[in-house]
Amino acid sequence: MQTWDMIEALRTRNAHKGVIPVDVPGIGPYECTDGWVFGYVGSPAGATWADLLAWMIEEDKAEDLADEPYKTFCDGLNLRFLSTLTQDPATIAQKFQTMAHINEVLRRFVKTKGKWEMYEQSQRRRLLFGIVSTPEDIAKNPQLQHRQWLTPVEHPERGATLRYPGAPYRLSETPWAIRRRAPTVGEHQEEALEEAAS
């Protein structure tokens, strides 16, 4: 965002918060029982905060978010709303407190689920939550397995076949292929030095 041009403020890096100095409910990392997910609820691409609240109510984990003032706040919580959040100085503190409470209730809700459960249930509801994947998660990811994304590559010096990340896309006319393993430390040093010297 052009913070200087628009509001004459220098933007400093503060993770995923942007110019809002509090965690935005539904946006950012959330801990599950067995790992983490990253949410982006309220963006134009997915379902709304009202949909997330309906899910929480359905599972009897919405606590007081179905009551006012939280319900109305949740129903309107989207990126457009966030752009107007700081326009009324008289209500900023209360809005930030409300957001902090909503986010704490959401954290408790997400913490009751495993990361795959949260991801799969979110997908069915069009809510944007993705798994923060460990290397093991990537190796076991059903979509990546189906696409045969991890590519076996021979490593003769190790006497092993290792799996490398594969093609980022598949094109029919220009197929992707891995030609060889990554070089070992210093393997091409002589070639590189000779080429640089010429």
Where are the regions a protein language model picked out?
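Short, solvent-exposed polar/charged micro-motifs at secondary-structure junctions
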Residues: 1, 93, 139-143
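Substrate-binding/catalytic subdomain of NAD(P)-dependent oxidoreductase enzymes
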Residues: 1-18, 24-27
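Short, solvent-exposed loop/turn segments at the edges of secondary structure
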Residues: 23-25, 32, 164-166
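Aromatic-enriched alpha-helical interface/lid elements that frame and gate functional surfaces
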Residues: 26-27, 33-125, 129
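Glycine-centered loop/turn motif at secondary-structure junctions
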Residues: 60, 126, 148, 197-198
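C-terminal core of ALDH-fold dehydrogenases
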Residues: 110-172
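Flexible, small-/acidic-enriched active-site or ligand-binding loops
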Residues: 155-198
